[in-house]
Curated annotation (Swiss-Prot):
Keyword Metal-binding: no
Superkingdom in the source lineage: Bacteria
Keyword Protein biosynthesis: yes
Keyword terms, alphabetized: Cytoplasm, Methylation, Protein biosynthesis
GO molecular function, one term: translation release factor activity, codon specific
Transmembrane spans: none
Source organism: Halalkalibacterium halodurans (strain ATCC BAA-125 / DSM 18197 / FERM 7344 / JCM 9153 / C-125)
PANTHER family reported for this sequence: LD18447P (PTHR43804:SF7)
Family membership: Belongs to the prokaryotic/mitochondrial release factor family.
Name by which UniProt lists this protein: Peptide chain release factor 1
HAMAP family: Rel_fac_1
Main location: cytoplasm
Positions carrying N5-methylglutamine: Q233
Post-translational modification: Methylated by PrmC. Methylation increases the termination efficiency of RF1.
Length: 356
C-alpha cells in the first residue's frame, strides 16, 4: 500500500511541474487531462503526507521515552504517543478507503427517470413523492435540478418524470437510488381504509459528454408533434415537442417541456446520450465476473431496493437491512443517513474483495 502511495506522491509532484510547463498550458487537451489526473489524486496525496508527518512525530516521541525523563515529562510524552497512535490508525483507515477502485462516473452530473409502475394512480402519486424527495435532497446538497420531461396525471402524480441533477458528486450519491421503490399506504381514494402496495421505479444515469458517446446524425430520426397536458389533451398548437429515435439501439426519447422546439431537442439529446452511454455501461457491467460486483445493488432496475411503510412511518432499505422510523424526514429529502450507510457498506465489501 505504501509503495503505491509513494508513487502517487511522486506523480503528483510531476504533474505540478507539467501544469506549469508553457507547452502544456498552450495545449488545452493536455492541460485538462493533467488537471483532472491531479485533482483525482489530490485528497489521497494530502492524507498520505499528513500520515507521514504523524509517523515522524510518533517515532520522535517514542525515541524521547528512551531518554531519562521525570515523571511529569514521561506522562506528557506517553499521552502524545497515544494521541499520535490514534491519528495514525485513523489516517491508515482513510487511506485504505481512498485507494479503493473508484467509479469513473462518480463526478458526473445525472439524469434521473422516475416512473409510476405497479399500482395505477397510487404508483403515479408515489412517483411524484419520490421526485419531490430528490428535489429537496438536491437542494440541500447545493445541486441544480431541471425538469426535462414530465407526464403528469390529473390527480397530481407522474406516469413519468425525467430531470437532470447538476453538481459535485451527484452520481456518487444518487446512483444508490437505482431500482424499484415500494410504498405501503392507504390511498386517498380508498374509503375502506385498506393498505395498498404500489411501486415506482427509479433509473439514475450518468450524464455523458459528447466525446464519450459518438452519435451520428444519420442514426437519429427526429419527429415533431404538438405538446400535450394531463390526460393527453393538446396544449400547444405549434409543433414544439420533439421525439428522437436512435436507430442502432432503438432508444426513444421525447421532450415537450419547453415552448421552443430547439430547446426540447437539446434536452432530448442530453437524455438520449445518457441512455446510450448507460446501455453500453450496463452491457460492460454484465460481462464482469459476478464475484467482482459490489453487494450493494446500483445497477439492476428491477431489484426492489426500498420500502416506504406509511402506517408504521418506516423506511427499509433491503440491500443492507437498514430500517429507519423516519419516513416523513426521508420524504422531505433527508437521505444522508441511508446513502452514507450504503457507501460505507460498499466500501467494506470492496475491501473484503481486495483482501480475498
Amino acid at each position: 500500500m505504501f509503495e503505491r502511495l509513494q508513487s502517487l506522491d511522486e506523480r503528483y509532484e510531476r504533474l505540478n511541474e507539467l501544469l506549469s510547463d508553457p507547452e502544456v498550458i498552450s495545449d488545452s487537451n493536455k492541460l485538462r487531462e493533467y488537471s483532472k489526473e491531479q485533482a483525482d489524486m489530490e485528497e489521497t496525496v494530502q492524507v498520505y503526507r499528513e500520515y507521514k508527518t504523524v509517523m515522524d512525530q510518533y517515532q520522535d516521541a517514542k525515541e524521547m521515552l528512551e531518554d531519562k525523563l521525570d515523571d511529569e515529562m514521561y506522562a506528557m510524552v506517553k499521552e502524545e504517543i497515544d494521541e499520535l497512535a490514534t491519528r495514525k490508525e485513523d489516517l491508515e483507515a482513510k487511506l485504505k478507503v481512498l485507494l479503493l477502485p473508484k467509479d469513473p462516473n462518480d463526478d458526473k452530473n445525472v439524469i434521473v427517470e422516475v416512473r409510476g409502475a405497479a399500482g395505477g394512480d397510487e404508483a403515479q402519486l408515489f412517483a411524484a413523492d419520490l421526485y419531490k424527495m430528490y428535489a429537496r435532497y438536491a437542494e440541500a446538497q447545493g445541486w441544480k435540478i431541471e425538469v426535462i420531461e414530465a407526464s403528469s396525471t390529473e390527480l397530481g402524480g407522474y406516469k413519468e418524470i425525467i430531470f437532470s441533477v447538476n453538481g459535485k458528486g451527484a452520481y456518487s450519491k444518487l446512483k444508490y437510488e437505482n431500482g424499484a421503490h415500494r410504498v405501503q399506504r392507504v390511498p386517498q381514494t380508498e374509503s375502506g381504509g385498506r393498505i395498498h402496495t404500489s411501486t415506482a421505479t427509479v433509473a439514475v444515469l450518468p450524464e455523458a459528454e459528447e466525446v464519450e458517446v459518438d452519435i451520428h446524425e444519420k442514426d437519429i430520426r427526429v419527429d415533431t408533434f404538438a405538446s400535450s397536458g394531463p390526460g393527453g389533451q393538446s396544449v400547444n398548437t405549434t409543433m414544439s415537442a420533439v421525439r428522437l429515435t436512435h436507430l442502432p439501439t432503438g432508444i426513444v426519447v421525447s421532450c415537450q417541456d419547453e415552448k421552443s422546439q430547439i430547446k426540447n431537442k437539446e434536452k432530448a439529446m442530453k437524455v438520449l446520450r445518457a441512455r446510450i452511454y448507460d446501455k453500453f455501461q450496463q452491457e460492460a457491467q454484465a460481462e464482469y465476473d459476478q464475484t467482482r460486483k459490489s453487494a450493494v445493488g446500483t445497477g439492476d432496475r428491477s431489484e426492489r431496493i426500498r420500502t416506504y411503510n406509511f402506517p408504521q412511518s418506516r423506511v427499509t432499505d433491503h440491500r443492507i437491512g437498514l430500517t429507519l422510523q423516519k419516513l416523513e424526514q426521508i420524504l422531505q429529502g433527508k437521505l444522508d443517513e441511508i446513502i452514507e450507510s450504503l457507501i460505507v457498506h460498499e466500501q467494506a465489501e470492496l475491501m473484503k474483495q481486495q483482501e480475498d
